[in-house]
């Protein structure tokens, strides 16, 4: 996605209101409360912070010790517009990002889809080294390769994941999966239909891959409210489901 300024503009414009982002941000906040109670002094790193939407959400909830970096100059610029002094830095060189700093929480959402297996494992090993005792690593990623559709082509996404893959990465890097599962379960049937239709269009050459844009856009307010309500219901009844378009994983350091 690096180099696609228009996609970062969409992200920046919708991160505080689009149902999908709001649900993800609530899930992260819930994880922090589950793990750390009401502590607001956590030192949190968002590695691959995009346009700073998650950092903004965390700040609004009282977390102040926030850091972030991204490999996109556009993303960094948008994050700085929100008042965050995020760094321009590549995740593949994470070991050189303030190498002596440690964190209670490291977050890396929807970035692994641009990396290969060995790169992911190496990055996880560095994250493990940087976590303080009792700390956690949180990662959200797109799920199931067949759900790619035009969104994946537009953003040049090379990989989608299943939970077992992330569990294997965790084990190889010295992590244990504390919590893991899928979400957007209630919306999975319509998402699957739309993405399957998009895949057919791509296969038949009915759409021009060079002119595609992502699925990130804000629907009409009533629709957005309805979808956000569906996600709130799911978060309450089935926060980690057996199916969904995203896979959410929380890892802790393996001891012994």
Residue ranges and their predicted role:
Residues 12, 137-159, 168:
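Short, glycine-/aromatic-enriched active-site segment of Class I SAM-dependent methyltransferases
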Residues 113-114:
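A short His-aromatic
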Residues 175-185:
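Conserved S-adenosyl-L-methionine
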């Amino acid at each position: 996605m690096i180099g696609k300024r228009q996609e970062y503009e969409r992200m920046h414009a919708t991160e505080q209101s689009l149902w999908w982002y709001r649900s993800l941000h609530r899930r992260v906040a819930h994880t922090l409360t589950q793990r750390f109670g009401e502590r607001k002094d956590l030192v949190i790193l968002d590695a691959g912070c995009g346009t700073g939407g998650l950092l903004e959400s965390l700040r609004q909830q009282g977390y102040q010790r926030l850091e972030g970096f991204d490999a996109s100059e556009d993303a960094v610029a948008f994050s700085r517009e929100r008042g965050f002094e995020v760094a321009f830095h590549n995740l593949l060189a994470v070991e050189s990002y303030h190498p002596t700093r440690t964190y209670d929480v490291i977050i890396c959402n929807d970035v692994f889809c641009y990396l290969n297996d060995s790169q992911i494992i190496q990055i996880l090993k560095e994250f493990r080294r940087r976590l303080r005792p009792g700390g956690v690593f949180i990662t959200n990623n797109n799920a199931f390769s067949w759900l790619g559709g035009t969104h994946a082509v537009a953003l040049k996404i090379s990989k989608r994941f299943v939970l077992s893959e992330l569990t294997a990465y965790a084990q190889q890097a010295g992590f244990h999966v504390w919590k893991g599962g899928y979400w957007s379960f209630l919306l999975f049937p319509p998402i699957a239909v739309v993405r399957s239709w998009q895949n057919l269009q791509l296969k038949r050459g009915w759409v021009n891959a060079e002119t595609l844009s992502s699925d990130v856009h804000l629907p009409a307010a009533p629709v957005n409210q309805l979808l956000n309500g569906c996600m709130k219901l799911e978060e309450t009844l089935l926060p980690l489901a057996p199916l969904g378009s995203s896979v959410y994983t929380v890892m802790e350091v393996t001891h012994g």
